Amino acid sequence: MIELRNLSQRFPGPGGWVEALRNINLTIPQGEVFGIIGRSGAGKSTLVRTINLLTRPTEGNVVVGGRDLTMLPAGALREARREIGMIFQHFNLLSSRTVFDNVALPLELAGASRAEIDAAVLPLLDLVGLSAQKDRYPSQISGGQKQRVGIARALASQPKVLLSDEATSALDPETTRSILDLLKRINRELGLTIVLITHQMEVIKQVCDRVAVLDAGRVVEEGRVIDVFLQPHHEVTRALIGDVIAQELPPALKARVAERLKTGRGHLLRLAFTGSGVDQPILSETIRRYELDFNILHGQIDEIQGQAFGSLAVLAGGEPGKVGQALAFLREQGVVVEELSYVE
Protein backbone atom coordinates (compact mmCIF):
# COMPACT_ATOMS: atom_id res chain seq x y z
CA MET A 1 0.00 0.00 0.00
CA ILE A 2 2.79 2.43 0.94
CA GLU A 3 6.35 2.20 -0.33
CA LEU A 4 9.14 4.60 0.53
CA ARG A 5 12.08 4.03 -1.80
CA ASN A 6 15.55 5.45 -1.13
CA LEU A 7 14.00 8.47 0.54
CA SER A 8 16.29 11.32 1.60
CA GLN A 9 15.55 14.84 2.77
CA ARG A 10 18.02 17.69 3.15
CA PHE A 11 17.41 21.18 4.48
CA PRO A 12 19.74 24.18 4.39
CA GLY A 13 20.98 25.07 7.87
CA PRO A 14 23.23 27.73 9.40
CA GLY A 15 26.26 25.43 9.21
CA GLY A 16 25.42 23.76 5.90
CA TRP A 17 22.99 21.11 4.75
CA VAL A 18 21.04 19.17 7.38
CA GLU A 19 20.34 15.50 6.58
CA ALA A 20 16.85 15.04 8.02
CA LEU A 21 16.22 11.68 6.30
CA ARG A 22 18.83 9.30 4.94
CA ASN A 23 18.01 6.59 2.42
CA ILE A 24 14.74 5.42 3.98
CA ASN A 25 13.23 2.21 2.55
CA LEU A 26 9.93 1.02 4.03
CA THR A 27 6.98 -1.04 2.82
CA ILE A 28 3.67 -0.81 4.70
CA PRO A 29 0.99 -3.31 3.60
CA GLN A 30 -2.65 -2.30 3.29
CA GLY A 31 -4.59 -2.50 6.55
CA GLU A 32 -1.53 -2.46 8.81
CA VAL A 33 -0.96 -0.20 11.80
CA PHE A 34 2.68 0.80 11.38
CA GLY A 35 4.57 2.72 14.04
CA ILE A 36 7.54 5.02 13.54
CA ILE A 37 9.34 5.84 16.77
CA GLY A 38 12.41 7.81 17.76
CA ARG A 39 13.64 10.48 20.08
CA SER A 40 13.12 14.18 19.40
CA GLY A 41 14.95 15.27 16.26
CA ALA A 42 15.16 11.75 14.80
CA GLY A 43 13.22 12.81 11.68
CA LYS A 44 9.84 11.23 12.49
CA SER A 45 7.60 14.17 11.59
CA THR A 46 9.62 14.91 8.46
CA LEU A 47 9.19 11.29 7.39
CA VAL A 48 5.43 11.14 7.90
CA ARG A 49 4.97 14.42 6.02
CA THR A 50 6.73 12.99 2.99
CA ILE A 51 4.03 10.30 2.71
CA ASN A 52 1.48 12.87 1.54
CA LEU A 53 4.17 15.17 0.14
CA LEU A 54 3.51 18.00 2.58
CA THR A 55 7.29 17.80 2.57
CA ARG A 56 8.71 16.83 -0.81
CA PRO A 57 11.75 14.55 -0.49
CA THR A 58 15.07 15.67 -1.90
CA GLU A 59 15.60 12.18 -3.32
CA GLY A 60 13.57 9.00 -3.63
CA ASN A 61 10.00 7.96 -4.33
CA VAL A 62 6.76 7.81 -2.35
CA VAL A 63 4.32 5.22 -3.72
CA VAL A 64 0.82 5.10 -2.21
CA GLY A 65 -1.80 2.75 -3.63
CA GLY A 66 0.41 2.02 -6.63
CA ARG A 67 0.86 5.70 -7.57
CA ASP A 68 4.21 7.46 -7.27
CA LEU A 69 3.20 10.75 -5.66
CA THR A 70 6.54 12.35 -6.45
CA MET A 71 5.78 12.03 -10.18
CA LEU A 72 2.22 13.39 -10.15
CA PRO A 73 1.31 16.85 -11.51
CA ALA A 74 -0.30 19.30 -9.07
CA GLY A 75 -3.92 18.44 -9.89
CA ALA A 76 -3.41 14.69 -9.66
CA LEU A 77 -1.47 15.13 -6.41
CA ARG A 78 -4.36 17.06 -4.85
CA GLU A 79 -6.69 14.23 -5.84
CA ALA A 80 -4.32 11.59 -4.42
CA ARG A 81 -4.06 13.47 -1.11
CA ARG A 82 -7.80 13.02 -0.57
CA GLU A 83 -7.04 9.36 0.05
CA ILE A 84 -4.60 10.27 2.84
CA GLY A 85 -6.03 11.67 6.08
CA MET A 86 -3.86 13.21 8.79
CA ILE A 87 -4.19 14.02 12.49
CA PHE A 88 -1.77 16.07 14.55
CA GLN A 89 -0.71 16.71 18.13
CA HIS A 90 -2.54 20.05 17.98
CA PHE A 91 -6.17 19.68 17.01
CA ASN A 92 -6.38 22.70 14.67
CA LEU A 93 -10.14 23.07 15.07
CA LEU A 94 -11.94 26.25 14.05
CA SER A 95 -13.27 27.81 17.24
CA SER A 96 -16.19 29.49 15.45
CA ARG A 97 -17.52 26.22 14.03
CA THR A 98 -19.39 23.46 15.83
CA VAL A 99 -18.13 19.90 16.10
CA PHE A 100 -20.35 18.95 13.16
CA ASP A 101 -19.15 21.85 11.03
CA ASN A 102 -15.47 21.17 11.79
CA VAL A 103 -15.87 17.60 10.56
CA ALA A 104 -17.83 18.82 7.53
CA LEU A 105 -15.18 21.34 6.46
CA PRO A 106 -13.22 19.10 4.02
CA LEU A 107 -16.47 18.09 2.34
CA GLU A 108 -17.58 21.70 2.00
CA LEU A 109 -14.25 22.59 0.41
CA ALA A 110 -14.70 19.67 -2.01
CA GLY A 111 -18.11 21.04 -3.05
CA ALA A 112 -20.31 18.37 -1.46
CA SER A 113 -24.04 19.06 -1.10
CA ARG A 114 -25.72 19.45 2.29
CA ALA A 115 -27.34 16.04 1.92
CA GLU A 116 -23.98 14.45 1.11
CA ILE A 117 -22.39 16.20 4.10
CA ASP A 118 -25.10 15.01 6.49
CA ALA A 119 -24.83 11.47 5.14
CA ALA A 120 -21.06 11.44 5.71
CA VAL A 121 -20.62 13.42 8.94
CA LEU A 122 -23.33 11.91 11.15
CA PRO A 123 -21.99 8.32 10.89
CA LEU A 124 -18.47 9.60 11.55
CA LEU A 125 -19.57 11.39 14.71
CA ASP A 126 -21.22 8.18 15.82
CA LEU A 127 -18.02 6.23 15.04
CA VAL A 128 -15.87 8.50 17.22
CA GLY A 129 -18.49 8.76 19.98
CA LEU A 130 -19.44 12.42 19.54
CA SER A 131 -23.03 12.30 18.29
CA ALA A 132 -24.25 14.03 21.45
CA GLN A 133 -21.64 16.81 21.09
CA LYS A 134 -22.27 17.65 17.42
CA ASP A 135 -23.67 21.13 18.15
CA ARG A 136 -21.01 22.11 20.68
CA TYR A 137 -18.03 24.35 19.99
CA PRO A 138 -14.37 23.38 20.58
CA SER A 139 -14.23 25.46 23.77
CA GLN A 140 -17.03 23.31 25.21
CA ILE A 141 -15.36 19.90 24.80
CA SER A 142 -12.33 18.16 26.33
CA GLY A 143 -8.91 17.60 24.76
CA GLY A 144 -9.69 13.97 24.03
CA GLN A 145 -12.97 14.94 22.39
CA LYS A 146 -11.15 17.55 20.29
CA GLN A 147 -8.80 14.84 19.02
CA ARG A 148 -11.82 12.69 18.18
CA VAL A 149 -13.16 15.59 16.11
CA GLY A 150 -9.78 15.73 14.37
CA ILE A 151 -9.97 12.01 13.61
CA ALA A 152 -13.53 12.29 12.25
CA ARG A 153 -12.50 15.25 10.10
CA ALA A 154 -9.54 13.27 8.72
CA LEU A 155 -11.92 10.44 7.80
CA ALA A 156 -14.48 12.69 6.10
CA SER A 157 -12.99 12.25 2.63
CA GLN A 158 -12.98 8.44 3.06
CA PRO A 159 -9.20 8.05 2.93
CA LYS A 160 -7.40 4.73 2.58
CA VAL A 161 -4.48 5.89 4.74
CA LEU A 162 -4.46 7.77 8.04
CA LEU A 163 -1.27 9.51 9.20
CA SER A 164 -1.00 10.27 12.92
CA ASP A 165 1.76 12.70 13.92
CA GLU A 166 2.14 12.54 17.73
CA ALA A 167 -1.66 12.65 18.01
CA THR A 168 -1.70 11.49 21.65
CA SER A 169 1.37 13.25 23.05
CA ALA A 170 -0.65 16.17 24.51
CA LEU A 171 -3.21 13.89 26.19
CA ASP A 172 -3.29 12.28 29.63
CA PRO A 173 -2.67 8.49 29.85
CA GLU A 174 -6.33 7.50 30.17
CA THR A 175 -7.38 9.67 27.23
CA THR A 176 -4.42 8.38 25.23
CA ARG A 177 -5.59 4.80 25.73
CA SER A 178 -9.11 5.69 24.61
CA ILE A 179 -7.81 7.39 21.44
CA LEU A 180 -5.57 4.41 20.65
CA ASP A 181 -8.51 2.05 21.17
CA LEU A 182 -10.49 4.20 18.73
CA LEU A 183 -7.68 4.02 16.14
CA LYS A 184 -7.55 0.23 16.48
CA ARG A 185 -11.30 0.07 15.99
CA ILE A 186 -11.11 2.29 12.90
CA ASN A 187 -8.34 0.11 11.51
CA ARG A 188 -10.38 -3.03 12.13
CA GLU A 189 -13.77 -1.77 10.91
CA LEU A 190 -12.67 0.37 7.96
CA GLY A 191 -9.57 -1.58 6.90
CA LEU A 192 -7.62 1.67 7.09
CA THR A 193 -3.83 1.70 6.88
CA ILE A 194 -2.50 3.76 9.79
CA VAL A 195 1.00 5.21 10.07
CA LEU A 196 1.58 6.36 13.61
CA ILE A 197 4.41 8.67 14.67
CA THR A 198 5.32 8.73 18.35
CA HIS A 199 8.19 8.99 20.81
CA GLN A 200 6.39 6.70 23.28
CA MET A 201 7.04 2.96 23.07
CA GLU A 202 3.93 2.39 25.20
CA VAL A 203 1.87 3.69 22.26
CA ILE A 204 3.66 1.34 19.86
CA LYS A 205 3.09 -1.58 22.23
CA GLN A 206 -0.63 -0.93 22.50
CA VAL A 207 -1.67 -0.41 18.90
CA CYS A 208 0.96 -1.20 16.24
CA ASP A 209 1.55 -4.36 14.20
CA ARG A 210 5.07 -3.43 13.11
CA VAL A 211 7.49 -0.66 14.00
CA ALA A 212 10.48 1.16 12.54
CA VAL A 213 12.96 2.85 14.86
CA LEU A 214 14.39 6.10 13.54
CA ASP A 215 17.65 7.70 14.67
CA ALA A 216 19.39 10.66 13.06
CA GLY A 217 17.26 10.28 9.94
CA ARG A 218 17.96 6.57 9.46
CA VAL A 219 15.89 3.45 10.10
CA VAL A 220 18.07 1.56 12.58
CA GLU A 221 15.62 -1.26 13.33
CA GLU A 222 12.37 -2.58 11.87
CA GLY A 223 10.11 -5.54 12.51
CA ARG A 224 7.06 -6.93 14.25
CA VAL A 225 6.47 -5.17 17.54
CA ILE A 226 6.68 -8.40 19.55
CA ASP A 227 10.01 -9.31 17.89
CA VAL A 228 11.50 -5.88 18.51
CA PHE A 229 10.51 -6.08 22.18
CA LEU A 230 11.91 -9.61 22.50
CA GLN A 231 15.23 -8.92 20.79
CA PRO A 232 16.08 -5.24 20.39
CA HIS A 233 19.36 -4.92 18.51
CA HIS A 234 20.11 -1.20 18.38
CA GLU A 235 21.00 0.84 21.46
CA VAL A 236 18.31 3.42 20.63
CA THR A 237 15.69 0.66 20.52
CA ARG A 238 16.90 -0.69 23.85
CA ALA A 239 16.61 2.74 25.43
CA LEU A 240 13.09 3.26 24.07
CA ILE A 241 11.94 -0.18 25.22
CA GLY A 242 13.47 0.52 28.62
CA ASP A 243 10.85 3.25 29.05
CA VAL A 244 8.22 0.47 29.12
CA ILE A 245 9.98 -2.76 30.11
CA ALA A 246 13.09 -2.56 32.27
CA GLN A 247 16.11 -3.83 30.32
CA GLU A 248 18.60 -3.43 33.15
CA LEU A 249 18.66 -4.16 36.85
CA PRO A 250 17.95 -1.30 39.24
CA PRO A 251 21.29 0.35 40.18
CA ALA A 252 21.35 -0.84 43.81
CA LEU A 253 20.57 -4.45 42.82
CA LYS A 254 23.08 -4.29 40.00
CA ALA A 255 25.81 -3.25 42.46
CA ARG A 256 24.98 -6.15 44.80
CA VAL A 257 25.02 -8.66 41.95
CA ALA A 258 28.38 -7.34 40.75
CA GLU A 259 29.82 -7.91 44.22
CA ARG A 260 28.46 -11.47 44.29
CA LEU A 261 29.90 -12.24 40.87
CA LYS A 262 33.33 -11.09 42.00
CA THR A 263 33.43 -13.78 44.69
CA GLY A 264 32.08 -16.72 42.75
CA ARG A 265 31.01 -17.90 39.41
CA GLY A 266 27.74 -17.41 37.65
CA HIS A 267 25.83 -16.22 34.66
CA LEU A 268 23.69 -13.10 34.70
CA LEU A 269 20.95 -13.67 32.11
CA ARG A 270 17.95 -11.94 30.67
CA LEU A 271 15.23 -14.38 29.64
CA ALA A 272 12.33 -13.25 27.48
CA PHE A 273 9.17 -15.36 27.08
CA THR A 274 6.22 -14.83 24.80
CA GLY A 275 2.91 -16.52 24.02
CA SER A 276 2.35 -19.89 25.69
CA GLY A 277 5.89 -19.82 27.08
CA VAL A 278 4.75 -17.31 29.69
CA ASP A 279 2.35 -19.89 31.18
CA GLN A 280 4.66 -22.93 31.03
CA PRO A 281 6.99 -24.09 33.87
CA ILE A 282 10.02 -23.88 31.59
CA LEU A 283 12.32 -22.44 34.24
CA SER A 284 11.53 -25.08 36.87
CA GLU A 285 11.95 -27.83 34.25
CA THR A 286 15.37 -26.40 33.37
CA ILE A 287 16.40 -26.34 37.03
CA ARG A 288 15.40 -29.99 37.55
CA ARG A 289 16.88 -31.26 34.32
CA TYR A 290 20.29 -29.58 34.60
CA GLU A 291 20.63 -29.26 38.41
CA LEU A 292 21.07 -25.49 38.34
CA ASP A 293 20.43 -22.73 40.81
CA PHE A 294 18.34 -19.87 39.38
CA ASN A 295 18.05 -16.74 41.48
CA ILE A 296 15.35 -14.48 40.02
CA LEU A 297 16.56 -10.90 40.43
CA HIS A 298 14.02 -8.90 38.50
CA GLY A 299 10.93 -9.68 36.44
CA GLN A 300 8.00 -8.25 34.56
CA ILE A 301 4.98 -9.61 32.69
CA ASP A 302 3.19 -7.43 30.16
CA GLU A 303 1.03 -7.71 27.08
CA ILE A 304 1.77 -6.66 23.51
CA GLN A 305 -1.18 -6.63 21.10
CA GLY A 306 -3.00 -9.14 23.28
CA GLN A 307 0.01 -11.46 23.44
CA ALA A 308 1.61 -12.19 26.82
CA PHE A 309 5.25 -11.16 27.19
CA GLY A 310 7.55 -11.87 30.13
CA SER A 311 11.08 -10.77 30.97
CA LEU A 312 13.27 -12.09 33.79
CA ALA A 313 16.76 -11.22 34.98
CA VAL A 314 18.25 -14.30 36.65
CA LEU A 315 21.56 -15.30 38.19
CA ALA A 316 22.32 -18.88 37.11
CA GLY A 317 24.80 -21.09 38.92
CA GLY A 318 25.98 -24.63 38.26
CA GLU A 319 28.54 -26.68 36.40
CA PRO A 320 29.70 -24.76 33.30
CA GLY A 321 28.86 -27.63 30.95
CA LYS A 322 25.37 -28.00 32.34
CA VAL A 323 24.81 -24.24 32.21
CA GLY A 324 25.59 -24.30 28.49
CA GLN A 325 23.21 -27.21 27.97
CA ALA A 326 20.51 -25.41 29.94
CA LEU A 327 20.81 -22.28 27.81
CA ALA A 328 20.51 -24.39 24.66
CA PHE A 329 17.41 -26.08 26.12
CA LEU A 330 15.81 -22.73 26.94
CA ARG A 331 16.40 -21.52 23.40
CA GLU A 332 14.83 -24.72 22.04
CA GLN A 333 11.71 -23.87 24.06
CA GLY A 334 11.47 -20.49 22.33
CA VAL A 335 12.98 -18.47 25.18
CA VAL A 336 15.16 -15.56 24.11
CA VAL A 337 18.35 -15.82 26.18
CA GLU A 338 20.74 -12.91 26.53
CA GLU A 339 23.88 -13.35 28.59
CA LEU A 340 24.53 -10.07 30.37
CA SER A 341 27.77 -11.05 32.10
CA TYR A 342 29.88 -14.01 33.13
CA VAL A 343 32.39 -14.08 35.94
CA GLU A 344 34.74 -17.07 36.60
From Swiss-Prot:
Cellular location(s): Cell inner membrane
Residues engaged in binding ATP: 38-45
EC nos: 7.4.2.11
Domain ABC transporter intervals: 2-241
Highest taxon, organism lineage: Bacteria
SUPFAM superfamilies linked to this entry: ACT-like (SSF55021), P-loop containing nucleoside triphosphate hydrolases (SSF52540)
Membrane topology: Peripheral membrane protein
Keyword Hydrolase on entry: no
Coiled-coil annotated residue ranges, if any: none
GO molecular function, one term: ABC-type D-methionine transporter activity
Function: Part of the ABC transporter complex MetNIQ involved in methionine import. Responsible for energy coupling to the transport system.
Assembly description: The complex is composed of two ATP-binding proteins (MetN), two transmembrane proteins (MetI) and a solute-binding protein (MetQ).
Protein name: Methionine import ATP-binding protein MetN 1
Record organism: Burkholderia lata (strain ATCC 17760 / DSM 23089 / LMG 22485 / NCIMB 9086 / R18194 / 383)
UniProt gene name: metN1
